[in-house]
């Protein structure tokens, strides 16, 4: 493995067998080296293989200016997230989370901590991601000796949601607001007190996450068969009426008209949450 470029003493780039650029990280990898020299395999700690040349360039920039210990800490957090969340996280997370952690630590050392305006929503809508965010604060404290405020757990959680949805951070924040607006409509329309540990609640939140993404992306879901919609409308009257209230709100604030398919699935999820809470109350 030959060095193509030396970014700093700890980070170099190489070309793989398909002539794709890879970023290789390890303490002392680039020290007293020149392009064309062989990489010392014993020093390699991490190899980043990003298929996009743009991502590779952005990652190279991040790794060139951020201390190795911060990079390896962010990598540990991402490994934990992959283990806990399952599924794929976008490669761009290596860039965004490393960059975020670096600046959060720098700001904290300067006494400038930022309040997370979506902290309340993140705690309730992204419980798994927020729990990982709290673990991440412990990892940062243990490895770097810096105790970041709890608001940073919320920011880290949003980065994880971003990596799952393959969206940009501003869009993730808009998605979160849409989700909270809908949950509030259901809560007050049906006079519910959510059980945030219930399976039906988690399924509803997951549905809302992807629904909000489609809404903001203007990608509606249609169905040629409307017979099930009519059954749901007739059978789940309260839930369907609540879904219509949501439709009115979305039309007013987002200029988006729900399809019958979207109305139907909202009603189904609302009914699941409502009926489960009703059963628990009866017990």
Curated annotation (Swiss-Prot):
GO terms for molecular function: RNA binding. Coiled coil: none annotated. SUPFAM superfamilies: PTS-regulatory domain, PRD, SacY-like RNA-binding domain. Keywords: Activator, Phosphoprotein, Repeat, RNA-binding, Transcription, Transcription regulation. Gene3D superfamilies: CAT RNA-binding domain (2.30.24.10), PRD domain (1.10.1790.10). Phosphorylated and inactivated by ArbF (EII-Bgl). The degree of phosphorylation is dependent on the presence or absence of beta-glucosides which act as inducers of the operon expression. Addition of inducer result in the rapid dephosphorylation of ArbG. It comes from the Bacteria. One of its GO terms (biological process) is positive regulation of DNA-templated transcription. The keyword Cytoplasm does not apply. Residues 65-170, 171-280 form the PRD domain. Belongs to the transcriptional antiterminator BglG family. Mediates the positive regulation of the beta-glucoside (arb) operon by functioning as a transcriptional antiterminator. This is an RNA-binding protein that recognizes a specific sequence located just upstream of two termination sites within the operon. This is Beta-glucoside operon antiterminator. The lineage of its organism: Bacteria, Pseudomonadati, Pseudomonadota, Gammaproteobacteria, Enterobacterales. The gene is arbG.
